[in-house]
């Protein structure tokens, strides 16, 4: 009975669906009538369906069986009252005979039919969509109507779903393997290689889709309604309008910077400075940095930093590579085969370098450095074993170390140019001297002559031949020195072992007579029984035992009258010493003068007295080779210069006062300041040394301006000037202010570098001397000339 009911219900449901479809079609076709009777139509349609169902019982047996199985699960949900005999008494035709359809007039929504369900509820039937011609789905092919059901559910069945009428949709036939191979070789037009999920058939492109794809590939316009070559509309003309469109004057705000915009800009600037607004570029960098930090995890990021120990010393940096270590060094750095052989034969510890420079055409051709491991190992040993000391660096401004010197313009006058050149000598001019009056210049040369020049005009006024240069090549004139007493006019000349005192006939009768008389007074000194004392002794150093020798010393010099030939040349007396006299210096009063004979041993320094014709040797022994000796300007002291030391002796007490240590290898000459508190010394090792006698025995200043041996230094007698001359042919002029305040150090300022003398046989300027009153400088050189340098 249950099966019967289920079959009846299934047939009734199918019958109801078919009748509903027919009813809707009839309503659409007869919509012009307001009310239509549908009883006869439904009966006819039902009878026809019953006949068709009877004929198709065998074909639809399986279909009914499947429907019955599907509805078996729903039998329990239906009430028995729904399947009572009373309900079965009424047919579908009888139920639908009472249904009335109402067509809404044209004033309402078009195509909408309002009706009622069997239970009386309102029902709206909308007409089927009548697509227009431009609709996308107007010409679409019929698709599968199985709904959104995956095809995998029908993999084991011969069909793939059901159509709207409930009939099966069979699976499309598949060709054989040969057909599939042919299809893969000869692809049909529009082939995509895809399967339609609704029908299971191959999905091909239509002609319209193929045409659209071709247009896209060829960069053509896909929409045919768009004209790419429309006529141009000239919105802006190239002709300038003469009259304005409007004559409204421009407002002032067009020409004045906007205050509101300035405020907004300042707000933005302030926000950027405070970090509230980050520029895009910086924001991008921060993001990149964050990403990089996130990828590169710092293993020791959370580790605590341990401060270094106070005594920790960092490893010194490696020295930068030199030209020899280049892969393409200059040719002069490459070793010759002989040098390479010598390098290979040397012990590794004795080699200057531990590699041989090589030259490569390109950096990519440079091989690996074989000594890198060994060098790193040795450096590690040095850092591990070699002691290191922390050296504190002094943060001193270099400019603060340079003293503030006044401008040279404020220190004038000083010589700056050559005014006069005295030409006439045929040999090197070794010495020169200025008359105390400042009018006459005396020069001595290797040609054996002494010449006297008028300073202002440069005219030679006197010449005397002291030596015959052709016969005596060993001796030459070393010193020419005027007597400081301007009333005598005596000129002292040293040549070899002899000292000549002469009075040139250029001063007048009174001065010449006074000078000759002063020289001749000494011959009558012992006429009245006077005894010449020759036992003057000055201790040479503090190590002497102080014992005095009362024995009479041998005569160290002879005072002889000149010969007739010498007297004819205005020579008044000749003093003969044991060795060649190289230096001579007068005492300020003009009665004493000191001479230096470097080769004479303990008699190297002799003091001569003009009024008594007396010569004394102050030292019983000599320490080293004596180079120069001078009297103190106003104290009874004698300054003796040896090769490395300068000693100051007190002649009245006959003791050594001070010993100066210039620090030079070989001193050449000295000169003392007119005030007597400072001394300068020159050396053959290109240095000029300034000593302050009130300070230490070491130099106060060391001047290294010359490039060759310094031959002469000289103080000006009146002005704060001094100079130095050397074999490089240059004369350096300095300003030297000595203060009365003993707490102030002397101020030394370089003023001028005078160049003019030529270098002959590695000899330049041999002697210099200042004018007694003016800021004039005289120089004598190996180029056989003497020069006057003036302001």
From Swiss-Prot:
UniProt keyword Nucleus present: yes
Highest taxon, organism lineage: Eukaryota
Keyword Magnesium: no
SUPFAM superfamilies: WD40 repeat-like
Residue numbers spanned by region Required for interaction with NOP7: 254-372
Acidic residues biased stretches: 25-60, 69-87
Composition skew (Polar residues), residue ranges: 1-12
GO biological process, one term: maturation of LSU-rRNA from tricistronic rRNA transcript (SSU-rRNA, 5.8S rRNA, LSU-rRNA)
Keywords: Nucleus, Repeat, Ribosome biogenesis, rRNA processing, WD repeat
Task performed by this protein: Component of the NOP7 complex, which is required for maturation of the 25S and 5.8S ribosomal RNAs and formation of the 60S ribosome.
Similarity-based family: Belongs to the WD repeat BOP1/ERB1 family.
Protein name: Ribosome biogenesis protein ERB1
Chain's gene name: ERB1
């Amino acid at each position: 009975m249950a099966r019967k009911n289920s079959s009846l219900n299934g047939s009734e449901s199918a019958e109801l669906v078919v009748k509903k479809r027919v009813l809707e079609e009839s309503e659409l076709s007869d919509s012009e009538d307001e009310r239509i009777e549908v009883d006869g139509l439904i009966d006819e349609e039902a009878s026809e369906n019953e006949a068709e169902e009877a004929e198709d019982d065998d074909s639809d047996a399986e279909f009914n069986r499947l429907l019955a199985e599907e509805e078996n699960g729903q039998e329990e949900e239906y009430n028995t009252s729904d399947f009572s005999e009373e309900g079965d008494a009424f047919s579908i035709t009888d139920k639908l005979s009472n249904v009335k359809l109402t067509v809404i007039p044209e004033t309402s929504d078009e195509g909408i039919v309002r009706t009622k369900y069997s239970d009386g509820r309102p029902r709206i039937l909308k007409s089927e969509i009548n697509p227009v011609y431009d609709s996308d789905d107007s010409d679409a092919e019929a698709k599968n109507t199985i709904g959104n059901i995956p095809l995998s559910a029908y993999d084991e069945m011969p069909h793939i779903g059901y159509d709207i009428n409930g009939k099966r949709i069979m699976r499309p036939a598949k060709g054989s393997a040969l057909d599939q191979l042919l299809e893969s070789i000869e692809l049909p037009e529009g082939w995509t290689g895809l399967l339609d999920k609704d029908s299971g058939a191959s999905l091909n492109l239509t002609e319209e889709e193929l045409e659209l794809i071709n247009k896209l590939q060829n960069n053509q316009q896909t929409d045919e309604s768009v004209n790419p070559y429309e006529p141009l509309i000239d919105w802006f003309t190239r002709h300038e309008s003469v009259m304005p469109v409007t004559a409204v004057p421009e407002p002032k705000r067009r020409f004045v910077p906007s205050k509101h915009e300035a405020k907004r800009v300042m707000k933005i600037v302030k926000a950027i400075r405070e970090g509230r607004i980050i520029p895009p570029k910086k924001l991008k960098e921060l993001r990149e940095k964050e990403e990089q930090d996130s990828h590169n995890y710092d293993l020791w990021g959370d580790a605590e930093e341990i401060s270094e120990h106070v005594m920790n010393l960092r490893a010194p940096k490696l020295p930068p590579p030199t030209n020899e270590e280049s892969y393409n060094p200059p040719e002069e750095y490459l070793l010759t085969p002989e040098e390479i052989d010598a390098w290979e034969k040397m012990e590794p510890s004795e080699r200057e370098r531990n590699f041989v420079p090589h030259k490569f055409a390109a950096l990519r051709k440079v091989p690996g450095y074989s000594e890198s491991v060994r060098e790193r190992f040795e450096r590690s040993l040095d850092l591990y074993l070699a002691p290191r000391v922390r050296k504190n660096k002094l943060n001193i401004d270099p400019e603060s170390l340079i003293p503030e010197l006044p401008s040279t313009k404020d220190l004038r006058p000083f010589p700056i140019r050559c005014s006069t050149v005295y030409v006439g000598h045929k040999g090197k001019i070794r010495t020169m001297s200025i008359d105390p009056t400042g009018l006459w210049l005396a020069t001595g040369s290797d040609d054996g002559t002494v010449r006297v020049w008028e300073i202002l005009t440069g005219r030679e006024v006197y010449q005397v031949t002291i030596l015959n240069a052709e016969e005596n090549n060993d001796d030459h004139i070393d010193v020419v020195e005027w007597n400081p007493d301007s009333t005598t006019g005596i000129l002292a000349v040293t040549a070899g072992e002899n000292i000549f005192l002469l009075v040139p006939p250029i001063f007048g009768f009174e001065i010449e007579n006074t000078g000759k008389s002063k020289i001749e007074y000494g011959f009558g000194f012992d006429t009245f029984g006077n005894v010449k004392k020759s036992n003057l002794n000055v201790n040479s150093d503090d190590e002497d035992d102080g014992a005095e020798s009362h024995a009479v010393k041998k005569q160290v010099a002879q005072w002889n009258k000149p010969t007739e030939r010498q007297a004819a040349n205005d020579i008044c007396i000749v003093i003969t010493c044991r060795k060649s006299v190289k230096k001579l210096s007068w005492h300020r009063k003009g009665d004493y003068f000191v001479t230096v004979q470097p080769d004479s041993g303990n008699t190297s320094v002799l003091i001569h007295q003009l009024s008594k014709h007396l010569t004394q040797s102050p030292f019983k022994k000599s320490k080293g080779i004596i180079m120069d000796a001078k009297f103190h300007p106003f104290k009874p002291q004698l300054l003796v210069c040896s090769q490395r030391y300068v000693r100051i002796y007190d002649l009245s007490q006959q003791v050594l006062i001070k010993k100066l240590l210039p620090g030079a290898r070989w001193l050449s000459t000295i000169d003392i300041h007119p005030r007597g508190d400072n001394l300068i010394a020159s050396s053959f090792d290109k240095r000029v040394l300034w000593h302050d006698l009130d300070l230490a025995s070491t130099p106060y200043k060391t001047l290294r301006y010359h490039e060759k041996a310094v031959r002469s230094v000289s103080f000006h007698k009146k002005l704060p000037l001094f100079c130095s001359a050397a074999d490089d042919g240059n004369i350096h002029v300095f300003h030297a202010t000595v203060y009365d305040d003993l707490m102030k150090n002397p101020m030394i300022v370089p003023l001028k570098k005078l160049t003019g003398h030529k270098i002959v046989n590695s000899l330049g300027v041999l002697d210099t001397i200042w004018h007694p009153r003016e800021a004039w400088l005289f120089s004598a050189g190996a180029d056989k000339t003497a020069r006057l340098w003036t302001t």
